[in-house]
Amino acid sequence: FGKILRDLIPAGDVLSDYVDTLTHESFDIGLAGLINGSIDAVLQLGTDDNPQLWITDYKSNRLDQDGDDTLIAAYGQERLFDAMAHHHYPLQALIYGTAMYRYLRWRAPHLSNHSDLVKGFSYFFIRGMVGPTTPPNTGVFTWQAPPGLWQRLSDRLAGGAL
């Protein structure tokens, strides 16, 4: 998955450092824990003519540490990404996205360009979402997939070339 991401995401993408983890020769993680759960929700945004599906997952991780001024401070983008990478949530989301792509191909063959229907994923860290006073982007990690990603990942899982 890492090599495919390396080909598709632009330099400076928020997942660039995680791609380094995925492509490092020492990377070895069992997939059982990543695919044991389920997608919490798939949200349809966009229009009827241009539907956009977003994979969402809710997390209850405690990210606050001694020395944090406020609970909200623990759920800013930098800390969210550290938690995402530590728990391999980006890899989990890539597996979810590929599964959604395959499901659409199977159950909705009349739709065109299944790979571009699945726009990306959002992880909602609910402890950092404290109501209407929550600052924008606090507690929410969102990533938009590059065009063609899901098809390439699906092909790879089917034994295709990188």
Give a label for each model feature.
Residues F1-L162:
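Structural signature of nuclease core domains in nucleic-acid processing machines
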